[in-house]
Regions:
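Glycine-rich, proline-tolerant flexible connector loops at the mouths of alpha/beta enzymes
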Residues: 32-35, 82-95, 147-149, 209-221, ...
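Glycine-enriched alpha-helix->loop->beta-strand junction motifs that scaffold or abut catalytic
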Residues: 130-137, 171-173, 199-203, 262-268
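Conserved SAM/AdoMet-binding glycine-rich loop
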Residues: 78-165, 170, 183, 246
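Conserved strand-turn element in the central/C-terminal portion of the radical SAM core barrel
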Residues: 88-91, 117, 164-189, 207-223, ...
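Hydrophobic faces of well-ordered beta-strands that scaffold small-molecule active sites
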Residues: 29-33, 81-83, 114-118, 137-139, ...
């Protein structure tokens, strides 16, 4: 189905994906608040705007700022707080305790589950995250083609990255896996990745279309076609009907939400409060300061589609299954 171009077949694929989602989740869609709290990174990924060698303005939020933003997101109605950072050596090597303290405070103050996306961390750090009760560990392989991985994630170890998420799962954390499209992969690579996501037991699986980043070696690539992304979302839904599958606001902003939900996604990610001094990842500024990535905006679109934002209790009930 990924390579078929008949519009009628594609619409039937999306229709089946929506029915599969409805069977498990009724008309409820989950909402994730996004706090990208440090854009410093030791890595030099060829696809990333925040790669180490890119001469850009960066920020690192204080623990107090992170907690305040998380509280504001919780009050706005999100179901989870997603804490994301680059592989910032300040936190990775010097003060990982600060990350743990922030997670503990957010859980206590908001009562919401937390997802941490810190890049590759040590087994000991994963154990400490798990002991704290951190629900999710997000770490994307981007591709499961090792040769392509080496071109995307320069001088990084495929097995080390895979080990981290498997170890997190072994320690009782839920795992999110993700891939990029439009970076030189084949349809066979995509199919392999979808299968691998199931093999590693990922409870949340995502795909994102590549957006060329200024100052990166892949700046000259063409922006990936979101139709392929939506087809992959639909196939993932049919393969893993009870999985969490995001529709990210980080690719096409709020205007791209409806198409991804129509393809079978059941999570809206990258909800960012305006005027908090935060960036997105693939589209670092799109819709952020204008308030286009808020619960209010996303909820209005869902209701227009006959869907409803899930409550915090409904999300916790899902996690307990």
């Amino acid at each position: 189905m990924l390579g078929r171009e008949d519009p009628a077949e594609t619409e039937e694929l999306f229709n089946r994906a929506r029915k599969a989602r409805e069977a498990f989740f009724s008309n409820r869609i989950f909402l994730y608040g996004f706090v990208y709290f440090s854009t410093w990174c030791r890595n030099d990924c060829n696809f990333c705007y925040f790669r180490r060698s890119n001469k850009i303005e960066r920020y690192r939020k204080t623990p107090e700022e992170i907690i305040a933003i998380a509280e504001a997101l919780a009050k706005s109605g999100v179901n989870l707080i997603d804490l994301t950072m680059g592989e910032d050596l300040r936190f990775h090597r010097e003060d990982f305790d600060a990350v743990l303290r922030v997670i503990k405070a957010i859980k206590e103050l908001t009562g919401l589950p937390v997802m941490i996306s810190p890049g590759v961390v040590t087994d000991d750090q994963i154990e400490r995250l798990a002991e704290l009760g951190t629900e999710w560990y997000a770490l994307y392989q981007e591709t499961h083609n090792r040769e392509l991985f080496s071109r995307l994630r320069v001088n990084q170890d495929y097995d080390e990255r895979m080990h981290a998420k498997l170890y997190a799962r072994e320690k009782g954390m839920l795992v999110e896996e993700g891939i990029l499209t439009g970076v030189g992969e084949s349809l066979a690579d995509i199919a392999d990745s979808i299968l691998e996501m199931g093999r590693i037991g990922a409870r949340q699986v995502r795909v994102m279309s590549f957006v060329p980043q200024p100052g990166s070696p892949m700046e000259g690539f063409k922006k990936a076609d979101s139709l392929l992304e939506r087809k992959i979302i639909a196939v993932m839904r049919l393969m893993y009907p009870d999985a969490l599958i995001p529709a990210s606001l980080d690719i096409d902003g709020i205007k791209g939400l409806e198409g991804r939900i129509d393809a079978g996604a059941n999570v809206i990610t990258s909800i960012i409060p305006p005027r908090a001094g935060l960036a997105g990842v693939a589209q670092s500024t799109m819709d952020v300061e204008e308030g286009g990535r808020t619960v209010e905006e996303a909820s209005a679109i869902l209701r227009k589609m006959g869907l409803q934002p899930a409550s915090a209790e409904e999300y916790k009930e899902y996690l307990s299954r």
